[in-house]
A protein has these predicted regions:
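Active-site- and interface-proximal helix/loop "cap" or "latch" segments in soluble metabolic
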Residues: 150-258, 263, 272, 285, ...
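Short, glycine/acidic-rich hinge or "gate" loops at secondary-structure transitions
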Residues: 106-114, 264-269, 294-298
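Terminal low-complexity/charged segments
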Residues: 1-173, 337-342, 350, 407, ...
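Short secondary-structure capping/junction motifs at helix and strand boundaries
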Residues: 101-110, 231-238, 290-294
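Short coil/turn segments at secondary-structure boundaries
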Residues: 49-51, 258-261, 293-298, 332, ...
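Intrinsically disordered, low-complexity regulatory segments
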Residues: 269-273, 277, 283-433
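Generic, well-ordered alpha-helical scaffold segments in large soluble proteins
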Residues: 37, 98-99, 224-228, 246, ...
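Flexible, glycine/threonine-enriched loop-and-boundary segments that flank and lead into catalytic domains
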Residues: 426-447
């Protein structure tokens, strides 16, 4: 008998009205058949999350950009684990157990992910949260094995303004044999804070989920809210949203180059990139009222229109910025720095595909996926994803430089021809489910939510870090210990969006 394919499994399932992609409810037998089918079919796992009675997964079929949402019931507190066939599911499964208490049957790793034993309750999103432990257990890590193996803990406190992440390295001399990340130190309780609120009220929490992707997260959340209620933002708002997203992309890429300059001692690179980023931040504040563009994108459109002279300010800033691109590229090509970055943090295409890594990391390794291809609003703009195949920091920086150039072109066209009309609509107090996505500076961002009479019953945001941190563990293995900070910078590792 021919085993069922994902297509036949979905065709035989109950489809729930979720927009723009239906959510398929699968009994455990069909969910296990899906797991078997994933052994042979190339669907990437985007996200895995839960509510009080079900577990949900979001899959992407790269070649056709097909998005698949599936769910299965939690029976006797458990559901069949996906991590055996999709390793990227492992941190999601650990997160689900921490927040809802659902157990991933046959999962290889059941250690806590977010819960460090410091919360006032356990299982905070379950119907019956438990009492906090009197003496919380410290995080556990595999024992170092082999002759002369030593352990080196790094973080979460580093004495710098940086993301709070704990890395446990196993070393042989100065070479890293294996690496394991432990996150959750910046958990904010975002999912609990959002429940019961309107999308417009919850948007403030989403805007603060990850500071360097505030526009992208807000945009994906707004699109999910609008899809759930079958509402569209006005044309002027859609154009402004695209402009804001590209402005954020340029700023974050410049921030990467500035950080790279600090870590490598390339003072010229740092000076050029930091100066350009500051110039863009001032223009953003003048045009939209916030240097990081926070709270501008909201469900229904944008919170306010561009300033009366905003288009002139942005175009003037772009004109000045264009002049910095040649010296920026020259600084990256300076022989000592170029030699240092060549081959750094190599990501094979197979690894990027296996873990579903997108953004600059995925495209720098040859994975041709950019969530903007799913965005109908980009349909009228000439745009093409930048792909490199070397998979190292040099390739990723080339992607960043060319994305900056592409963003300049997109913003220039948008700022010159903004449609007239309102910048927002009021969302109806209806019920429904929606999924939204946006291409953030570090990769694809996805939001799902369920609304009940205008209020959020359940929601989940998927940050690119869910794919990038497991990938970093593979990349760090074999690297030199002195390169850890540089590799973290190279891969664009952040934690706040993943820590929820």
């Amino acid at each position: 008998m021919t085993p069922p394919t994902i297509a036949t499994i979905l065709a035989a399932s109950q489809a729930e009205p979720c927009r723009p992609w239906p959510r398929h409810r699968l009994p455990h037998t069909a969910w296990r058949a899906l797991i078997d089918a994933l052994r042979h079919e190339p669907h990437r796992l985007l996200a895995l999350w839960a509510d009080t009675i079900e577990v949900h997964a979001l899959l992407l079929h790269d070649p056709g950009l097909g998005v698949v949402a599936v769910s299965t019931a939690v029976e006797v507190g458990a559901y069949p684990a996906l991590s055996a066939v999709r390793p990227a599911a492992e941190p999601f499964e650990r997160m689900i157990r921490d927040l809802w208490g659902h157990h991933a049957a046959d999962a290889g790793d059941e250690r806590p992910w977010l819960d460090h034993g410091q919360w006032p309750v356990t299982l905070p999103l379950s119907p019956r949260p438990g009492s906090a432990p009197i003496e919380p257990e410290p995080p556990s890590f595999p024992t170092a094995e082999g002759d002369h193996a030593t352990r080196l803990p790094i973080g979460p406190v580093a004495g710098l303004i940086t993301d709070a992440a704990h890395l446990r390295l196993t070393l042989s001399g100065t070479a890293i044999r294996s690496a394991e990340a432990h996150l959750g130190y910046t958990h904010k309780g975002t999912l609990a804070l959002m429940r019961g609120k309107s999308p417009r009220a919850a948007a403030r929490f989403i805007a603060r989920l990850s500071g360097d992707a505030t526009v992208a997260h807000s945009l994906a959340f707004a699109r999910a809210s609008e899809a759930a209620l079958e509402t569209e933002a006005p044309p002027r708002a859609q154009a402004l949203r695209l402009l804001l997203a590209e402005w954020e992309r340029m700023s974050v890429h410049l921030g990467h180059f500035a950080d790279l300059g600090v870590l490598t001692g390339a003072a010229g690179l740092h000076r050029i990139a930091e100066g350009a980023r500051e110039h863009l931040a001032r223009a953003a504040e003048a045009a939209f009222g916030h240097r990081l563009l926070m709270d501008v994108v909201v469900p229904g459109g944008v919170s306010h229109d561009i300033a009366p002279d905003g288009q002139v300010v942005l175009r003037a800033a772009l004109t000045a910025f264009v002049e910095t691109l040649p010296p920026l590229a020259a600084a990256l090509e300076h022989p000592p720095l170029a030699s240092r970055l060549s081959g750094l943090a190599h990501v094979p295409l197979a690894l990027a595909n296996r873990l579903g890594a997108g953004g600059v990391v995925g495209r720098g390794s040859g994975r041709a996926f950019d969530a903007r291809a799913l965005d109908e609003a980009h349909g009228g703009i000439e745009w093409e994803a930048e792909i490199q195949r070397q998979g190292d920091e040099t390739a990723r920086n080339l992607v960043r430089l060319r994305e900056i150039a592409a963003s300049i072109g997109i913003i220039d066209r948008l700022s010159g021809f903004l449609p007239d009309g309102p910048v927002a609509v009021t969302l109806p107090a209806g019920s429904g489910e929606g999924i939204g996505c946006a291409e953030g500076p570090h990769g694809d961002i996805w939001h799902w939510l369920r609304l009940d009479h205008g209020h959020i019953a359940a929601a989940f945001p998927r940050d690119p870090a869910w794919a990038l941190w497991p990938l970093a563990e593979h990349v760090l293995a074999g690297a030199a210990v002195e390169d850890v900070a540089l590799i973290r910078c190279s891969l664009g590792l952040t934690v706040s969006g993943m820590d929820l």
